[in-house]
């Protein structure tokens, strides 16, 4: 929160979280760290790892599979309000509506949770192409 406060973004809803974080990184690399570009690159890399926290138990029920994102989710939970959730194709996707009633597919499988991301439907948090 100190970083966001130093660039004027106290509340995450006031501006794009990605914009606030970018502004904070630029300010830190120019002012408080004496222009050390390596700190700037390291913090940008931390932001790339932070996007993995999109896959939590709420959006990805099969949390038991060990993946890079799941192993680093606990490490980056504190950054969860500073970024937008990204899907593998690189587009920013935020949930707009959630249907909580179970549905049945044609093959008989039950979908327990369906999330709609900006008009695209996904079953159990996995985006349909």
From Swiss-Prot:
GO terms for cellular component: membrane. It is found in: Membrane. The chain crosses the membrane at residues 33-50. It comes from the Eukaryota. It is a single-pass membrane protein. The lineage of its organism: Eukaryota, Fungi, Dikarya, Ascomycota, Saccharomycotina. Partially overlaps STP3. This is Putative uncharacterized protein YLR374C. Keywords: Membrane, Transmembrane, Transmembrane helix.
């Amino acid at each position: 929160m100190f970083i966001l406060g130093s660039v004027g973004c106290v509340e995450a809803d006031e501006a794009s979280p990605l914009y606030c974080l970018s502004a904070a990184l630029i300010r830190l690399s120019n002012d408080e760290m004496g222009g050390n570009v390596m700190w700037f690159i390291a913090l940008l890399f931390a932001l790339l790892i932070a996007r993995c926290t999109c896959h939590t138990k709420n959006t990805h029920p099969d949390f038991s599979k060990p993946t890079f994102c799941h192993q680093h989710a606990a490490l980056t939970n504190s950054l969860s309000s500073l970024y937008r959730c990204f899907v593998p194709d690189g587009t920013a996707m935020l949930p707009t509506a959630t249907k909580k009633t179970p549905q049945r597919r044609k093959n008989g499988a039950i979908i327990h949770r369906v999330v709609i991301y900006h008009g695209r439907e996904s079953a159990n948090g996995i985006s349909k192409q």
